[in-house]
């Protein structure tokens, strides 16, 4: 009959299906893709160490100045005296204590002057020269401050305990305030030594 059409369904065989190309191309092999990894900029941890370095230097200044003030202001006069003698103790009676004050003052001044160099290391963490300079100078200050603190500590020990073999009596029973002040100054100086040692370790890690 006219106007009518007949639809005929043709079933494909498996062989004919294999011969046809796939509609979607397979994804390319993973080996052909180049992965671009953007590396984080270096120097982040070095900048953090440099900031901590500045904080430690400020703490070292406080400890060194505390040692200088405590030792430099040490002065005690006993309330009794004789016709010819007045019993008085001052830090400059002993050259070791005088050296102690000078050495810790030098250390405090150095730490203050080294802060701008340490700030440069914060701004430019990759610079090696300033860090090497600070490491060298910190090591010198460790030696100076340790010598001053060790010498003063030996005198403080004798002041507290005396020495029976040398017939040196302990004086801290009479000059109690004097001994307390010089002992505090020695402790502050050793704290400065510890701070300087930490600064050397930080500088070594920052190189």
From Swiss-Prot:
Single GO cellular component term: plasma membrane
Function of the molecule: Regulates membrane-cell wall junctions and localized cell wall deposition. Required for establishment of the Casparian strip membrane domain (CSD) and the subsequent formation of Casparian strips, a cell wall modification of the root endodermis that determines an apoplastic barrier between the intraorganismal apoplasm and the extraorganismal apoplasm and prevents lateral diffusion.
Stored InterPro entries? CASP/CASPL (IPR006459), CASP_dom (IPR006702), CASPL (IPR044173)
Q: Which organism is it from?
A: Taraxacum kok-saghyz (Russian dandelion)
* Bias (Polar residues): 1-12
Q: Mitochondrion among the record's keywords?
A: no
| Region of interest: Disordered | 1-24
* UniProt subcellular location: Cell membrane
Which sequence ranges are marked TM in the entry? 49-69, 99-119, 139-159, 185-205
Question: Is Cell inner membrane among this UniProt entry's keywords?
Answer: no
Protein name stated in the entry: Casparian strip membrane protein 1
One GO biological process term is: cell wall organization
